[in-house]
C-alpha cells in the first residue's frame, strides 16, 4: 500500500509537467544595443546554444507584432508583415482599432499568451498610445514568467537610449499619461520600456531600406522557429557535448565540398538526439534545412516518394500536395533542379539496408557546394555502402560515467546528483546500464521514490544482464516492475494502438479492470509511452520492439502467444483452428475478404480484442468468445444468400465497430440479436458503405440498444424505429444519413450527459418532437442537424461551440462560445443580425465574438435594409462579425449582394457560389479583405463585375494566394485595366483559375500575369482570344509548374503556341485548342513531365524530346508523333486513346527505345496483328499496362509477351476477341489483374498448378469473362492466395 501511495503522490506532483512534455528553444544571444554608447545594429538572431526549453501549450501564433498604427502601419509594419507571410510565419498583427474599453480585451490577451516571439515596433508615437504601453507591459510580464518567449524589438527612427530612459518624445508622452493613470501603472509601463530598450534589436533610420530590413528580420525570425520540431528535453542533452563536437569536426563546415556524415550505434544510444542537437546548432548557417525522421518505417510503409515530397516541401516551403511529381524519378529530378541549388542541411534519421541515397536524392555531386547531409542508422554496414560518396562515419558510443550518473539522477531523484545516502547504489546501477540513455531514463524513472529494497532487487536483475549485447533485457526490467494491469496496457499499445486515439481503448481497459486513467499516467512517468497533442498514443521504437518481442518470447508458436498483429499469422490461426486460451488479441489489418466460420474461434476463450478487415463471420457462436470486449470488422459484408450468423451472445462486448459495411441478410445477419444480448456495450459504430454499394443497409422493426452505451454512431442505415428511452449515459449520438421512421422512448432533452449530437440529413415522422427540448442540454458542445428538415429548435443549448443546422436560430445572441456556424437549406432563411452603427453590445455579432467560420448554404438570407442618407439605402456596414476567418455563401437566394465584407479584415477564405441569380450587378468590398488568401467564385449568374479586386491586388499587403472564378456567364470584367506600374507586384499569388466565363474580357488579367511572379498553377478556359501574341505574357511566369489552356471556337486565330524558354519549372501542360496546328518549343521545357492534348483536332505534329509522361486523347487528326523513336528516352508514362488516324503500329515498334517506360495505356487504338504486341515484352521496367481494344481488333486472340515483364504489378486487359493469355503465372510481382470484358477468354493458365505462384496478387476481376470453364474457376478458389479479392463473372467471391 505504501508503494501505491507513493505512486499516487508521484502522479499528483508530475501530472502538470507530463502534460507539457514538449519544449521549444528560445534565442540566447545578448543584446546588440550597447548600454555604453546607446548605439544599435542589426541583430544576428541565431541560436548557437543547445540549451533546451519547452514548447508552449496551445500555441496559435509564431509572431506577435505590436505597433502604433499611424506611425508604421502603412510603411514598415506592412513590409514586415508581408515578408513574414512569405516565410509562412503565422503572425498576429494588432491594430489600434481592435482595442475597445479601458483594458486589453480577452482576444488580445489570448493572442499575446499564445505567441512565441514578440516584435514591438517602437516608434516616436508608441508611448502616446496607452494601448501600446498596455500591450508592451503584458508582453514583458509574459516573457518574465516564461523565458522561452523572445522579445525582438525594432527601434523605428528613434534612439534606443530615449526608449530606455523615457527621454525625448517619451518624456512628453508620460506627462500626459500621469494625469489619467495611477503611479503604479505608469511605473509598470516605464519598466517595460526600459527592459525592451535594453534588449538587442534592429534600428531603422531615415535612409535605411525598410523592405530589405523587413526581409532580414523575417529571415532571422525564421531561423528561430524553423527549429521548432527539433524538440530536445533537458535530459536528452546530458552527455552529448562530445558527440556534437566530433560530428561538427567531421562536417567540416569551412570546406567547400558537399559532405556526408553517418552516425551509427545501437538503438537508444542517442543517435537521433545527437543529430537534432547538431542540426539546432548549425541550421542557421544554411539557406534551407530539413530533418526527416523515421526513414526506415516511412519507406517501408509509404515508399521513397513520400520522403522525397517531404524533403521538397520542407526546403521550398510549399505544400507536399503541390510538389509536382508522383514517382521517384520525378522526385530526383525535382530535387536536382529545384533543391540542389540551395546550400542545404538535411538529416535523414534511422535508415536501414533498404535505403539508397541515390534512389531518394540522386547524386551528391548535384548539390551546391557546402551542403551537408547527416544520416543515422543502427548499422555501420548500411552507412558503409555510402563510402563511395565519401561518407564520414562516426560511432555514437555509450555515455561517460559522470554523464550517465547525471542523466540517471534526473529521473531517479529529479536532480543532477544523487543524495549521499543513495550515492553508492546509484553508481552501481549506472555501472550496469552500459551508458545507454534510454535505459538510464527508464530505469531511473522506475526507481523514483522507491525504497532501498526495491533498488537492491533492481540492481541484482541488472547485473544478470551484463553480458547481453542488446538493450531488450535491460529495458524489460522496467516492464517487469509494472503492475499486471499496466503490463497489459503497455503490450496492447505496442502491438495495436500506436498512433490511435486513446478514447476507445480506455473503454476496453476500464472494463478489464486495467485502470487506464492511473496506469497511463504511470507509463508516461516511467518514460514508456507518450500521448500526443491529439490524444494519440506514441512510443519509442525500441520500446515498441521490446513489447512485441516480449509477446514473441511467450512461445515459439504464434497461436500460443497473447497477441497476434501479423495478418498472415492471424489468418493461419483462424482458418486452421489453432486457437488457444492464451490468445488475448488478434488484428488482421489488411483485407482478406474471407469467411471465418464459428469453428474457427474454438478455444479462444480469453480473446478480448478482434480486428479483421473485410472478413465475414458465419455459423453458430453460442458459447464462443465469452470474454470478447472489442469487435471491429471494417468493410464487413453479409448478404441474403450468405450463411447466417446465429446465437451471437457475447455478453461482455464493450465496443462494436462495423464501418463501411454492407449487411443485407435477415435480422441483419444475426447482429441485431447480438446487440440485445451485449448488455455492457459502451461504443457502437455502424455504417454502411453507401458510396460503394449505392444503397443503405436497412434495420427492420424497433432497435433497442443496451442502456450502457455512451457512444452510438450510425451512418447511412435505414431504420424503422430506434428506442433511446434508456440511453441515459450517452455522450455522443450520431445518426447521419439515416432515414428513421420513429425515435421512441423519450426526447433528446433527457440525455443530460450528451456532448455531441449529429442528426445530419435525417428524416422521420417524429424527429421534430424529440428535439423540441434540446435547449436543456447544458453539456452539449457540438450539434449538427443540417439536412434534417423536420427538426425545429426553439432554443439552442448555450454552451455550443459548433452548430450546423437547417433550422432558425432564435437565440443566436446567447451562443457566446460559438466558433463554427453552418446553416444549410433552412426553409425559414437565416435572419442576418442587424448591427448597430456603433457596434456596441446590442449587436448580435458583437456578442458572438468567437465566431471563426460561417457557412450559409441553400438558404435565404433575411436582412433589413437601412434607408437613410448615411447608409445609401443599403445594409449596415458591420453586418458580419469581424472575427470571421472563413465565409462560404452557396446558393443563397437573398441578398443580391454581399454586405459588409469589406470589414472582414481577418477573413482568409471567401467562397461565393450561385447567389447572384437576380442581380445584374457587381461584387464589391474586396479591397478591405487584407487577410484574404483564398477567393472562390463559381456559378454566379448576373455577376457583371468584381469591384475592388484591382485595389486588393495593388495593395502592398495583398496576401491572395489562390483565386478561382468559374462558370460566371454574365461576367464582363475582372480588372478594368491591366495592373500597371513597376511597384505593383503580387508575390503571394500561387494559383489562378478562370474558366467558363464566355463574356469576360480576359485581356487585362492575362496581360497582368507578369505581376504574379510566384504563380505556380494557371488554368485558363476562356474565349475571345484572337491573337497568338495575347498569350505571350504566360511566358514570363518562371515559377509556373502547371499550365492548362482551353480555348473554344471563338479563338480560331490561335493556330500556333510558342513555349517560352523561361518556363523551366513547368512539369504539366494541358492543351485543349481546336484550332491549334503546332506547338513550338516543347524541347525547351526541360522539366516537362506530363503533356495532355485533348480536342486538338487540327494538331499535326509534336516535337517530344524531354518528356516524362505523354497522354494523348481525342485528337482525330493526329497522324504523327515526330522524333518519338530516338528523342524520348526519358519517357515513363505513355497513354494513347481515341486517335483513329494515328499510325500506332510504328509507335508500338519504337517502344524499346523508351527504356524507362513504366506505365503504358493503349485504349481504343487500331491494332490488327498479334505480332505487333510482341515488342511489349521488351519493356522490362513496365509497372502498369492497360490494353483496351474494341471489336475492330478481332484478330487479337492471344497474348504471349507477358513472361518477361517481371516488374509488372498492374495489368488491365479488355479485348473481346482474346481467347488465351500466356505467361501470367510468371508475373511474380503482379498485384492487380483486371480482365473485365474479355468475353472470349477460355483460360488464364495452361497449367492450373501454376496459379499458386502469384503470391502477391491482391485483386482479380474476371467479371464479363463468360467463357471461362467451371473447372478453371474452381481451381482459382483453391490455389490463389487467401488475400486475393476476386470478382467473378456473376458475383463476388468470399
From Swiss-Prot:
The record marks 131 as: Important for ADPR cyclization. Keywords: Hydrolase, Leucine-rich repeat, NAD, Plant defense, Repeat, Signal. Residues 34-54 are annotated as: Disordered. Changing residue 201 to Y: Reduced ability to promote cell death and impaired homooligomerization. Residues 1-29 form the signal peptide. One of its GO terms (molecular function) is NADP+ nucleosidase activity. Residues 59-221 form the TIR domain. This is Disease resistance protein L6.
Amino acid at each position: 500500500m505504501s508503494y501505491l501511495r507513493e505512486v499516487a503522490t508521484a502522479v499528483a506532483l508530475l501530472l502538470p509537467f507530463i502534460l507539457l512534455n514538449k519544449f521549444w528553444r528560445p534565442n540566447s544571444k545578448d543584446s546588440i544595443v550597447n548600454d555604453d554608447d546607446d548605439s544599435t545594429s542589426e541583430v544576428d538572431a541565431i541560436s548557437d546554444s543547445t540549451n533546451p526549453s519547452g514548447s508552449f501549450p496551445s500555441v496559435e501564433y509564431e509572431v506577435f507584432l505590436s505597433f502604433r498604427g499611424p506611425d508604421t502601419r502603412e510603411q514598415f509594419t506592412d513590409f514586415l508583415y508581408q515578408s513574414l507571410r512569405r516565410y509562412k510565419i503565422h503572425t498576429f498583427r494588432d491594430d489600434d482599432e481592435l482595442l475597445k474599453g479601458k483594458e486589453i480585451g480577452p482576444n488580445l490577451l489570448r493572442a499575446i499568451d499564445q505567441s512565441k516571439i514578440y516584435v514591438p515596433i517602437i516608434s516616436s508615437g508608441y508611448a502616446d498610445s496607452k494601448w501600446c504601453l498596455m500591450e508592451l507591459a503584458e508582453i514583458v510580464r509574459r516573457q518574465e514568467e516564461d523565458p522561452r518567449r523572445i522579445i525582438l524589438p525594432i527601434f523605428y527612427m528613434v534612439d534606443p537610449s530615449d526608449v530606455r530612459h523615457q527621454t525625448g518624445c517619451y518624456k512628453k508622452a508620460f506627462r500626459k499619461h500621469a494625469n489619467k493613470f495611477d503611479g503604479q501603472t505608469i511605473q509598470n509601463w516605464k519598466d517595460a520600456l526600459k527592459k525592451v530598450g535594453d534588449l538587442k534589436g534592429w534600428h531603422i533610420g531615415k535612409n535605411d531600406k525598410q523592405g530589405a530590413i523587413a526581409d532580414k528580420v523575417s529571415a532571422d525570425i525564421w531561423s528561430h522557429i524553423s527549429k521548432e520540431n527539433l524538440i530536445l528535453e533537458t535530459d536528452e542533452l546530458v552527455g552529448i557535448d562530445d558527440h556534437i563536437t566530433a560530428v561538427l569536426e567531421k562536417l567540416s563546415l569551412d570546406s567547400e565540398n558537399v559532405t556526408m556524415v553517418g552516425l551509427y550505434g545501437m538503438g537508444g544510444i542517442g543517435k537521433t538526439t545527437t543529430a537534432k542537437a547538431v542540426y539546432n546548432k548549425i541550421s542557421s548557417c544554411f539557406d534551407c534545412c530539413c530533418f526527416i525522421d523515421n526513414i526506415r518505417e516511412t519507406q517501408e510503409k509509404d515508399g521513397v516518394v513520400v520522403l522525397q515530397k517531404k524533403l521538397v516541401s520542407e526546403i521550398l516551403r510549399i505544400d507536399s500536395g503541390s510538389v509536382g511529381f508522383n514517382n521517384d524519378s520525378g522526385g530526383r529530378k525535382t530535387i536536382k533542379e529545384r533543391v540542389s541549388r540551395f546550400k542545404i542541411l538535411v538529416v535523414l534519421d534511422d535508415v536501414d539496408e533498404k535505403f539508397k541515397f541515390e534512389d531518394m536524392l540522386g547524386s551528391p555531386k548535384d548539390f551546391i557546394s557546402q551542403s551537408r547531409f547527416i544520416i543515422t542508422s543502427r548499422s555501420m554496414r548500411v552507412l558503409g555502402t555510402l563510402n563511395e560518396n565519401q561518407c564520414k562515419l562516426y560511432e555514437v558510443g555509450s555515455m561517460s560515467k559522470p554523464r550517465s550518473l547525471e542523466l540517471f539522477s534526473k529521473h531517479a531523484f529529479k536532480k543532477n546528483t544523487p543524495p549521499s545516502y543513495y550515492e553508492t547504489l546509484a553508481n552501481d546501477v549506472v555501472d550496469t546500464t552500459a551508458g545507454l540513455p534510454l535505459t538510464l531514463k527508464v530505469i531511473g524513472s522506475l526507481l523514483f521514490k522507491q525504497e532501498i529494497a526495491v533498488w537492491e532487487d533492481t540492481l541484482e536483475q541488472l547485473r544478470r544482464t551484463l553480458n547481453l549485447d542488446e538493450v531488450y533485457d535491460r529495458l524489460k526490467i522496467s516492464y517487469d516492475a509494472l503492475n499486471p494491469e499496466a503490463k497489459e496496457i503497455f503490450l496492447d499499445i505496442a502491438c495495436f494502438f500506436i498512433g490511435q486515439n486513446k478514447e476507445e481503448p480506455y473503454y476496453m481497459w476500464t472494463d478489464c479492470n486495467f485502470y487506464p486513467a492511473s496506469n497511463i499516467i504511470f507509463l508516461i512517468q516511467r518514460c514508456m509511452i507518450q500521448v500526443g497533442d491529439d490524444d494519440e498514443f506514441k512510443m519509442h521504437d525500441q520500446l515498441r520492439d521490446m513489447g512485441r518481442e516480449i509477446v514473441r518470447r511467450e512461445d515459439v508458436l504464434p497461436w500460443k502467444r497473447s497477441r497476434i498483429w501479423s495478418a498472415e499469422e492471424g489468418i493461419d490461426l483462424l482458418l486452421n483452428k489453432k486457437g488457444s486460451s492464451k490468445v488475448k488479441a488478434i488484428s488482421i489489418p489488411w483485407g482478406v475478404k474471407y469467411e471465418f466460420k464459428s469453428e474457427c474461434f474454438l478455444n479462444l476463450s480469453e480473446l478480448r480484442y478482434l480486428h479483421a478487415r473485410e472478413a465475414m463471420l458465419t455459423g453458430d457462436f453460442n458459447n464462443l468468445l465469452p470474454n470478447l470486449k472489442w469487435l471491429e470488422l471494417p468493410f464487413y459484408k453479409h448478404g441474403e444468400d450468405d450463411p447466417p450468423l446465429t446465437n451471437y451472445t457475447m455478453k461482455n462486448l464493450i465496443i462494436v465497430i462495423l464501418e463501411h459495411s454492407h449487411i443485407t441478410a435477415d435480422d441483419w445477419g444475426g447482429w441485431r440479436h447480438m446487440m440485445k444480448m451485449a448488455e455492457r456495450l459502451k461504443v457502437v459504430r455502424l455504417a454502411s458503405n453507401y458510396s460503394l454499394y449505392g444503397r443503405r443497409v436497412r434495420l427492420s422493426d424497433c432497435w433497442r440498444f443496451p442502456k450502457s452505451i455512451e457512444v452510438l454512431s450510425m451512418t447511412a442505415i435505414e431504420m424503422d424505429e430506434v428506442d433511446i428511452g434508456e440511453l441515459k449515459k450517452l455522450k455522443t449520438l450520431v445518426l447521419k444519413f439515416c432515414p428513421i421512421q420513429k425515435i421512441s422512448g423519450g426526447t433528446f432533452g433527457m440525455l443530460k450527459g450528451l456532448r455531441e449530437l449529429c442528426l445530419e440529413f435525417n428524416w422521420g415522422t417524429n424527429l421534430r418532437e424529440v428535439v423540441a427540448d434540446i435547449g436543456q442540454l447544458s453539456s452539449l458542445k457540438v450539434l449538427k442537424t443540417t439536412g434534417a428538415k423536420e427538426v425545429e429548435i426553439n432554443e439552442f443549448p448555450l454552451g455550443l461551440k459548433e452548430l450546423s443546422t437547417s433550422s432558425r436560430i432564435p437565440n443566436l445572441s446567447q451562443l457566446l462560445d460559438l466558433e463554427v456556424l453552418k446553416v444549410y437549406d433552412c426553409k425559414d432563411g437565416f435572419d442576418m443580425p442587424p448591427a448597430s452603427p456603433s457596434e456596441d453590445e446590442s449587436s448580435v455579432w458583437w456578442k458572438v465574438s468567437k465566431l471563426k467560420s460561417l457557412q450559409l448554404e441553400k438558404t435565404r438570407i433575411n436582412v433589413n435594409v437601412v434607408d437613410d442618407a448615411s447608409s445609401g439605402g443599403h445594409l449596415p456596414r458591420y453586418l458580419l462579425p469581424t472575427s470571421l476567418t472563413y465565409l462560404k455563401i452557396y446558393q443563397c437566394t437573398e441578398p443580391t449582394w454581399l454586405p459588409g465584407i469589406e470589414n472582414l479584415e481577418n477573413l482568409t477564405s471567401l467562397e461565393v457560389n450561385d447567389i447572384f441569380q437576380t442581380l445584374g450587378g457587381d461584387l464589391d468590398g474586396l479591397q478591405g479583405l487584407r487577410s484574404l488568401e483564398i477567393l472562390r467564385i463559381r456559378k454566379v449568374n448576373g455577376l457583371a463585375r468584381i469591384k475592388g479586386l484591382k485595389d486588393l491586388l495593388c495593395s502592398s499587403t495583398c496576401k491572395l494566394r489562390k483565386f478561382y472564378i468559374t462558370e460566371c456567364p454574365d461576367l464582363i470584367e475582372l480588372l478594368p485595366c491591366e495592373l500597371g506600374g513597376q511597384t505593383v507586384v503580387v508575390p503571394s499569388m500561387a494559383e489562378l483559375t478562370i474558366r467558363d466565363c464566355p463574356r469576360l474580357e480576359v485581356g487585362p488579367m492575362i496581360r497582368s500575369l507578369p505581376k504574379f511572379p510566384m504563380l505556380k498553377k494557371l488554368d485558363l478556359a476562356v474565349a475571345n482570344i484572337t491573337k497568338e501574341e495575347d498569350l505571350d505574357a504566360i511566358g514570363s511566369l518562371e515559377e509556373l509548374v502547371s499550365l492548362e489552356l482551353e480555348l473554344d471556337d471563338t479563338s480560331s486565330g490561335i493556330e500556333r503556341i510558342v513555349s517560352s524558354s523561361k518556363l523551366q519549372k513547368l512539369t504539366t501542360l494541358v492543351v485543349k485548342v481546336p484550332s491549334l496546328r503546332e506547338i513550338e518549343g516543347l524541347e525547351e521545357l526541360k522539366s516537362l513531365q506530363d503533356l495532355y492534348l485533348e480536342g486538338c483536332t487540327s494538331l499535326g505534329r509534336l516535337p517530344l524530346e524531354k518528356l516524362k509522361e505523354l497522354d494523348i486523347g481525342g485528337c482525330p487528326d493526329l497522324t504523327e508523333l515526330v522524333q518519338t523513336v530516338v528523342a524520348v528516352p526519358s519517357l515513363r508514362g505513355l497513354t494513347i486513346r481515341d486517335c483513329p488516324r494515328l499510325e500506332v503500329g510504328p509507335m508500338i515498334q519504337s517502344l524499346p527505345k523508351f527504356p524507362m517506360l513504366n506505365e503504358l495505356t493503349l485504349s481504343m487504338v487500331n491494332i490488327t496483328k498479334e505480332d505487333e504486341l510482341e515488342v511489349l515484352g521488351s519493356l522490362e521496367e513496365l509497372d502498369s499496362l492497360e490494353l483496351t481494344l474494341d471489336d475492330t481488333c478481332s484478330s487479337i486472340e492471344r497474348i504471349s509477351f507477358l513472361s518477361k515483364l517481371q516488374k509488372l504489378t498492374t495489368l488491365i486487359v479488355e479485348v473481346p476477341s482474346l481467347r488465351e493469355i500466356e505467361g501470367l503465372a510468371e508475373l511474380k510481382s503482379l498485384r492487380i489483374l483486371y480482365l473485365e470484358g474479355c468475353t472470349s477468354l477460355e483460360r488464364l493458365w495452361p497449367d492450373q498448378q501454376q496459379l499458386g505462384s502469384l503470391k502477391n496478387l491482391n485483386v482479380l476481376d474476371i467479371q464479363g469473362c463468360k467463357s471461362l470453364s467451371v473447372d478453371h474457376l474452381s481451381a482459382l478458389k483453391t490455389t490463389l492466395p487467401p488475400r486475393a479479392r476476386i470478382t467473378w463473372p456473376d458475383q463476388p467471391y468470399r
